[in-house]
């Protein structure tokens, strides 16, 4: 049976990291939102009514990274050294990639994953009127494949 560091019987606790040494940390995460091709084209050409979708998603991801300990209960507050947010697209999707670096006692995977998640949710929010069908449903739109693609310690 695996050993869980945050769980002791029916008690949940934040792991004590005070004895760990500080080292450089980096995590890169990505995730994808699937959209209608017309929506991706509107994002590319800057014709979405709400404004610049990717600039807004980039700001949202950056804010989310910095707020991760307020969203995930047992996540440590750590000093963030840098955040980069990049986007790539296909005809029917946009992939967000968030890289977070820090110098500290614990990793930054949760921060990178939170940044990706909020970037993709922001894109959805900004284009939802274009994505809905005649019944107000989202038959094409979906968020998937959110994962850590790289982690460096030291």
UniProtKB/Swiss-Prot annotation:
Catalytic residues identified in the record: 125
GO terms, biological process: Mo-molybdopterin cofactor biosynthetic process
Keyword Lyase in record: yes
Reactions mediated catalytically: (8S)-3',8-cyclo-7,8-dihydroguanosine 5'-triphosphate = cyclic pyranopterin phosphate + diphosphate
Annotated substrate binding sites: 74-76, 110-111
EC number: 4.6.1.17
CDD domains: MoaC_A
Subunit-level organization: Homohexamer; trimer of dimers.
Protein name (record): Probable cyclic pyranopterin monophosphate synthase
Source organism per UniProt: Methanosphaerula palustris (strain ATCC BAA-1556 / DSM 19958 / E1-9c)
Name of the encoding gene: moaC
């Amino acid at each position: 049976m695996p050993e869980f560091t945050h769980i002791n019987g029916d008690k949940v606790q934040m792991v004590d990291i005070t004895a760990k040494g500080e080292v450089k940390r980096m995590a890169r995460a990505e995730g994808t939102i699937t959209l209608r091709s017309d929506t991706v084209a509107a994002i590319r050409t800057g014709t979405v009514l709400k404004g610049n979708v990717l600039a807004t998603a980039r700001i949202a991801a950056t804010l989310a990274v910095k707020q991760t300990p307020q969203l995930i209960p047992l996540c440590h507050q750590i000093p963030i050294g840098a955040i980069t947010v990049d986007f790539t697209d296909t005809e029917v999707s946009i992939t967000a990639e968030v890289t977070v670096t820090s110098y500290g006692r614990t990793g930054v995977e949760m921060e990178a994953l939170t940044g990706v998640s909020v970037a993709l949710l922001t894109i959805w929010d900004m284009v939802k009127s274009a994505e809905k069908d005649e019944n107000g449903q989202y038959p094409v739109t979906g968020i998937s494949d959110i994962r850590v693609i790289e982690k460096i310690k030291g």
